[in-house]
UniProtKB/Swiss-Prot annotation:
Lineage top rank: taxon: Bacteria
Protein residues bound to Mg(2+): D80, D138
Origin organism lineage: Bacteria, Pseudomonadati, Pseudomonadota, Gammaproteobacteria, Enterobacterales
Organism encoding this protein: Escherichia albertii
Cofactor: binding details: Binds 1 Mg(2+) ion per subunit.
Name of the protein in question: Cyclic GMP-AMP synthase
The protein's required cofactors: Mg(2+)
Positions annotated to bind ATP 2: N124
Length: 443
């Protein structure tokens, strides 16, 4: 197992960390269509409302080509559409709140003719829509003159030039391969944030801050995993004392969050630092285990054989003995087996239970990670998920997509991996129907 190739490899376009972070072409094309439709609607609506030239400029992750797949099928990705009004709003006494409210009314009108869109809760610096197709559109609105650009916020007009910071990010590296590496590293960090902040309620490290950090701290090595490790260590060192990322153009802080969110971010950055330090002197197998835990279902399935002691993980002393209880789509019990690989029909449900859970420390935890592979799962924005519980607790999952998938069970205690098992699940399209062969003679 080459851990670097699990991050990114020219020869592997199907199952790497980089590939698994990228949005499905089907999902992205739907989002682009919605984006274009919304722009054309707002162009006419706002032109009449403000009696001025109205233009649009895409910004954020979509513009910088660092969009990543949402963390699960219940989450969404963002496309940011900057709305520009070409008149001096302040000079004409136009209040920023009135501008935002007019934009919100226009978005509400759009929702009335598009049942896939719902109005988002208003934010200080933008309004937006949430679509049913995994898409969120944020629409910050500005006024622009020959000498200034101001963003409409609830607190007034604010200096802001997203195009300038985007140009800074785009042009930070001149070499094409350096730019490509930077974008990949940004995606890796965003995947890490998605996983570690999921369901916590804490504000995430903003995408713009991640872009600036990666640009300023990117370390180039022959191996892709080393690029991530040493870039992460440099970033962690930068943020260790104070969680501040300065805008390189105006010195403002790109990370602004409540104290509890800041403490949580420091905790996760400390964990990231320790993982990366552990990886420096580790072999590929041990690195793979660390990265599987770090990125969870975004990371490709790794292979460990803890039974033979060849893992390079001396702490792995017990192999989870997992039984799989299988039910068909009608809830009828089909079988209960202990196996490393099984074939099921789409619609079946599987319950995984660690039979020897008593062999593990009573304070350990079991992390169950589902990894879905294939176009059906990819287009449904469901490449997997991770659930943590007690080793004595069973875990149930469905079988919604045809293809080869895995269920990974990782037993953790005090941050150390003390057990590991992978079960491969082959999902067939449907129950096979045997056709009767009718033999007859022709006269």
């Amino acid at each position: 197992m080459n851990c670097s190739d699990l991050f990114y490899a020219d020869t592997n376009t199907e199952n790497t960390l980089h590939q698994r972070t990228q949005l499905s072409e089907v999902i992205l094309s739907k989002g682009i269509a919605k984006k274009n439709e919304l722009i054309e609607f707002l162009r006419q609506e706002l032109k009449e409302a403000f009696d001025c030239d109205v233009r649009f400029w895409l910004q954020g992750s979509y513009k910088s080509h660092t969009l990543i797949k949402p963390v699960d099928k219940f989450s969404s990705y963002d496309i940011d559409i900057g709305v520009y009004l070409f008149f001096d709003a302040e000079n004409e006494g136009v209040d920023s709140k009135d501008v935002k409210e007019t934009l919100r009314d226009a978005l509400l009108s759009y929702c009335s003719i598009n049942n896939e869109a719902k109005l988002q809760e208003s934010k200080n610096a933008c309004e937006g829509l949430k679509f049913s197709t995994f898409l969120t559109v944020d629409t910050p609105i500005y006024y622009k003159t020959d000498t200034k650009i101001k963003l409409a916020t609830d607190k007034g007009w604010s200096d802001s030039d997203p195009k300038a910071i985007q140009d800074w990010i785009t042009n930070y590296y001149k070499d094409k391969s350096d730019r490509a590496l930077m974008k990949r590293l940004v995606r890796y960090f965003k995947a890490w944030v998605n996983v570690k902040w999921q369901n916590t309620g804490f504000k995430k490290i903003p995408s713009l801050a991640i872009n600036v950090l990666v640009a300023q701290h990117m370390k180039q090595h022959v191996r892709e995993d080393d690029c991530f490790i040493y870039t992460a260590l440099s970033i962690c060192e930068e943020l260790e004392s104070t969680l501040i990322v300065r805008n390189p153009l105006n010195n403002s802080n790109l990370i602004s969050m409540p104290q509890d969110a800041e403490c949580f971010a420091h905790q996760k950055l400390d964990e990231l630092k320790q993982v990366c330090l552990s990886c420096i002197k580790s072999d590929d197998i041990k690195r793979g285990a660390h990265f599987s835990n770090l990125f969870q279902h975004y990371f490709p399935q790794i292979s460990l054989d803890s039974a033979t002691g060849s893992t390079g993980l001396p702490t792995v002393v017990n192999v989870p003995e997992i039984s799989v209880c299988r039910y068909d789509k009608n809830g009828n019990h089909v079988e209960t087996i202990i196996t490393d690989r099984l074939t099921v029909n789409k619609g079946d449900s599987l319950t995984f239970t660690i039979r020897n859970h008593y062999d593990f420390n009573i304070y350990s935890s079991a992390q169950w990670t589902v990894r879905n592979i294939g176009s059906q799962a990819n287009d449904a924005n469901d490449i997997g998920h991770s659930v943590t519980g007690k080793p004595s607790e069973s875990h149930k999952r469905g079988t919604s997509y045809t293809g080869s998938h895995t269920m990974e069970c990782m037993i953790l205690h005090n941050g150390a991996i003390i057990g590991f098992k992978t079960i491969h699940v082959i999902v067939k399209p449907a129950r096979t129907v045997r056709r009767k062969t009718l033999k007859f003679w022709r006269a």
